[in-house]
Design a protein with these regions (language model features):
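Motif- and composition-driven signal specific to adenylation
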Residues: 1-145
Length: 145
């Protein structure tokens, strides 16, 4: 993931996924390995879109992960556009609907949206796709380095 998305000292990753899920591994270790900052959300904050906006703004989060159903809930917040620090929004765990991808790109114009896929048994993520405005679908993508 570092080769593909290049975190650096100016980045902040929000660790918000419960530790029982595979994504929490990269949320926790990736920023530490790359010299970026790690912001840790309080338990349950990932379920409250308004609070999540506050946390993203408070810590100037640049990178975070959502399963698409949680991204849909987050997009329900009228305050999403205030998350101007976001540079990377990563989705995995469920199919990412094209409509949701387009809504996210429109409301967070400073952020890239990535769809990742990978069976937990083999690795956390093995393929990736960069979503683009106007895409009619969201494939699982190509192998990630």
């Amino acid at each position: 993931m570092q080769q593909a998305y290049g975190l650096d000292a100016g980045d902040t990753v929000l660790q918000k996924t419960p530790f029982s899920f595979d994504v929490s591994v990269w949320e926790f270790f990736w920023p530490l390995l790359a010299g970026a900052r790690l912001a840790v959300a309080q338990p349950g904050e990932h379920r409250d879109p308004e609070r999540l906006v506050e946390v993203i703004r408070q810590y100037a989060v640049t990178t975070l992960h959502f399963v698409p159903s949680m991204l849909q809930a987050f997009m329900g917040s009228a305050e999403v556009e205030r998350c101007s620090s976001l540079k990377r929004v990563v989705c995995s765990g469920e199919a990412l609907p094209a409509e949701l991808a387009q809504q996210t790109l429109a409301r967070l114009p400073g952020a890239q949206l990535y769809n990742l896929y990978g069976p937990t048994e083999a690795a956390i993520d093995v393929t990736h796709w960069t979503c683009r405005p106007g895409d009619s679908g969201v494939p699982i993508g190509r192998p990630i380095d």
